[in-house]
């Protein structure tokens, strides 16, 4: 009987410790030490949340830079996910040798009518990548400049100002940040 009492006491202590004290402590530390990151790195404009620095979103208007292709169609709405039964995040699971991937890439290149950077025709692992390579951004400049009636050199300068270096891959830009800056021109 004493063994059962000790076991139940330990279960209760661990339940309170792991179920309440630890999560509340980690949440409090996150809010105090890293408030922006703990709340999703949200970007606000005029007091309204317009996106997150860490999650890509779909841009359809030709006056904006477009992010990478999304295998999940940028579906981040939990209710839509439940209704559709589809994932909120994920890659296409197409390997490099998959004929479906090759077909989709060729169709995208044919539709655009020009040579494109690899991230312009392939999905990211999560399907919600917020960044594109500088090459991808520069390939979109001509269309954006025409749509906005802005000199392309201004847009190229904007890309260079927002460029982030990557030690392991090509330099990149955050699409949301780039589009916000573009609207300020």
Curated annotation (Swiss-Prot):
Cellular component annotations (GO), alphabetically ordered: plasma membrane
Residue span of region Disordered: 113-132
Record-annotated membrane-spanning stretches: 8-28
Sample GO molecular function, one term: ATP binding
InterPro entries linked: KdpC
Keywords per UniProt: ATP-binding, Cell membrane, Ion transport, Membrane, Nucleotide-binding, Potassium, Potassium transport, Transmembrane, Transmembrane helix, Transport
Heme keyword on record: no
Residue ranges, compositional bias (Polar residues): 114-126
Keyword Cell membrane among UniProt keywords: yes
Location of this chain's protein in the cell: Cell membrane
Membrane topology: Single-pass membrane protein
Subunit structure: The system is composed of three essential subunits: KdpA, KdpB and KdpC.
PANTHER family xrefs: POTASSIUM-TRANSPORTING ATPASE C CHAIN (PTHR30042), POTASSIUM-TRANSPORTING ATPASE KDPC SUBUNIT (PTHR30042:SF2)
Family per record: Belongs to the KdpC family.
Task performed by this protein: Part of the high-affinity ATP-driven potassium transport (or Kdp) system, which catalyzes the hydrolysis of ATP coupled with the electrogenic transport of potassium into the cytoplasm. This subunit acts as a catalytic chaperone that increases the ATP-binding affinity of the ATP-hydrolyzing subunit KdpB by the formation of a transient KdpB/KdpC/ATP ternary complex.
Annotated protein name in UniProt: Potassium-transporting ATPase KdpC subunit
């Amino acid at each position: 009987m004493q063994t059962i009492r000790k076991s139940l006491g330990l279960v209760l202590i661990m339940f309170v410790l792991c179920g309440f004290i630890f999560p509340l402590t980690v949440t409090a530390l996150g809010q105090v030490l890293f408030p922006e990151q703990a709340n999703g790195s949200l970007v606000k404009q005029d007091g309204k949340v317009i996106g997150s620095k860490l999650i890509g979103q779909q841009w359809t208007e030709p006056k904006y830079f477009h992010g990478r292709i999304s295998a999940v169609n940028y579906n981040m709405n939990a209710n839509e996910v439940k209704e559709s039964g589809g994932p909120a995040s994920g890659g296409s699971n197409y390997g490099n040798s998959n004929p479906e991937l090759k077909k989709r890439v060729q169709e995208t290149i044919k539709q655009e009518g020009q040579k494109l950077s690899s991230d312009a025709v392939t999905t990211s692992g999560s399907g919600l990548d917020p960044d594109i390579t500088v090459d991808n951004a520069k390939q979109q400049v001509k269309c954006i400049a025409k749509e906005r009636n802005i000199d392309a050199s201004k847009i190229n300068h904007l890309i260079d100002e927002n460029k982030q270096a990557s030690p392991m891959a090509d330099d990149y830009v955050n699409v949301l940040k780039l589009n916000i800056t573009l609207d300020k021109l």
